[in-house]
Amino acid sequence: MSLIHRRLYRISGLSSVNAWNLQIREAVNRNDPVESLLLFREMKRGGFEPNNFTFPFVAKACARLADVGCCEMVHAHLIKSPFWSDVFVGTATVDMFVKCNSVDYAAKVFERMPERDATTWNAMLSGFCQSGHTDKAFSLFREMRLNEITPDSVTVMTLIQSASFEKSLKLLEAMHAVGIRLGVDVQVTVANTWISTYGKCGDLDSAKLVFEAIDRGDRTVVSWNSMFKAYSVFGEAFDAFGLYCLMLREEFKPDLSTFINLAASCQNPETLTQGRLIHSHAIHLGTDQDIEAINTFISMYSKSEDTCSARLLFDIMTSRTCVSWTVMISGYAEKGDMDEALALFHAMIKSGEKPDLVTLLSLISGCGKFGSLETGKWIDARADIYGCKRDNVMICNALIDMYSKCGSIHEARDIFDNTPEKTVVTWTTMIAGYALNGIFLEALKLFSKMIDLDYKPNHITFLAVLQACAHSGSLEKGWEYFHIMKQVYNISPGLDHYSCMVDLLGRKGKLEEALELIRNMSAKPDAGIWGALLNACKIHRNVKIAEQAAESLFNLEPQMAAPYVEMANIYAAAGMWDGFARIRSIMKQRNIKKYPGESVIQVNGKNHSFTVGEHGHVENEVIYFTLNGLSLFAKDKHVLYKDVYKEQSYELFI
């Protein structure tokens, strides 16, 4: 019997509106929205008028289809019926338009409703939140309170979504306070949402407090997973692993989400051991065969610099998605193995899997990071073929960054000028490109133009501008932008901004001012800041301040060789050989070695790597003959002496 005949047979005995409603509801419940709408049509043709139970079922079917045309058709029938003012029907209609991304239609229906309950308000709030209209959502929430409608847990969780979307800690804290006043904070579903959102908004401590406040008997697997997700945002693998052990001791059974979030926490070489333990447990529990889990583990191994394990997982996959290919390609690109990344990209095309925007962005980013200009040009020329045209702002931003890092600043500017819809990221990337390539005045000029065109700079924009000021020695301009950032744009300086200012002051020889700035910082200075000061001390031969900077670096990064070598060189340049010997002794005691630096250049599409003091290159004789010839052009004997001394000092520590 055909589908049409079966339908005709089924509806032939329907003799009442309730019978039709039952059939429509069953079709919706078995996720067959098309059948629901066909039944609705046949019901109308049969002379049966829908009632206040029919319309909510049909509205749900339209929402499942996400078809605005169907929504408008059902709404047209509704406004002709006597049930348009029914609060239950009206709420279902608002929800229908919201789920079809027609928030404006939903708002019109909402405004015309003579009666609304908390569910109606929640449906409209959800629409504004999902569409990113945070201001409208909170304005509606205020209106809801003025109308004396009591919010419930759904209201709170809906508005938490807005805070999550905006990554606004202030909004989240405000909704947390509302939730406590309403008494919904004791509900575990609300607490779970708070935990994950606090993590996303950058407040791990508050996420921990909410988790710990949940009674042990009330915690669910979702509670633990929410906390793991918060840890993954910060890359706190060790704390996440400790919490996972506690979860097992309390006899909770981990699920797929548990392992995905835990693996997402282990994204660097230091946490590879924890990542492997998590992976082995996932295998033991049989949750490692899910494609999303495999993709996450591939990403984990790749970012932990274990591309061999990542590739093994990738190769044994029975089926792959675009994400599978992309995370593996990205792993090679991040490591600098562009040849392997490109080979895998070709294999992806050959397999019939179409690369997406993220795939191309991964390749372009890798080319910029490791200076693979020719490969970058090849990808740029073929981006259109894979549906990522030059008018895509994300592609434009990535290409500007890539060409800038590869030294092709004119190509970067050409893309910038031809980007149709520039964003703050576009301007920031171009400014950073100029700063990176030593074209500092152009960077500052472009920043001024950005401000004139009413673009609002962010913290990364100011970082690029301060770097330009530092490298150009523009101390006055640097202070000006540093204060503008705080006073005009309300952006709190981060450690990187302070590092730039320390670098700028150091270059100008104002080491006491730089040290004072560090001491007055609200945050604890990191290795980058002390390193900038130490480098400035080396340039200006200030042993006293250098010792303070070096001591801080020794405490922060006791196994990093660079600060020891820098301090030893400062002592040597000052003729303080006792200090020089003391640093050497400390390095031997702590088994710290300075490995020679490596650089890579690309000639005729082929990468060539060199290390400091290397004598094993196939073109060794030609290279050193050329270098010796170039050294004859060094007119300043002091500069030449410093270069020779620096090479000798490196050899002492290798």
Curated annotation (Swiss-Prot):
SUPFAM superfamilies: HCP-like. Gene3D superfamilies: Tetratricopeptide repeat domain. One of its GO terms (molecular function) is RNA binding. Keywords: Mitochondrion, Repeat, Transit peptide. Residues 605-635 are annotated as: Type E(+) motif. PPR repeats lie at residues 86-116, 117-151, 152-186, 187-217, 220-254, 255-289, 290-320, 321-355, 356-390, 392-422, 423-457, 458-488, 494-524. It is found in: Mitochondrion. Residues 529-604 are annotated as: Type E motif. The keyword Transit peptide applies. GO terms for biological process: RNA modification. One of its GO terms (cellular component) is mitochondrion. Coiled coil: none annotated. Residues 1-65 form a transit peptide. Belongs to the PPR family. PCMP-E subfamily. This is Pentatricopeptide repeat-containing protein At4g19191, mitochondrial. The lineage of its organism: Eukaryota, Viridiplantae, Streptophyta, Embryophyta, Tracheophyta. The gene is PCMP-E1.
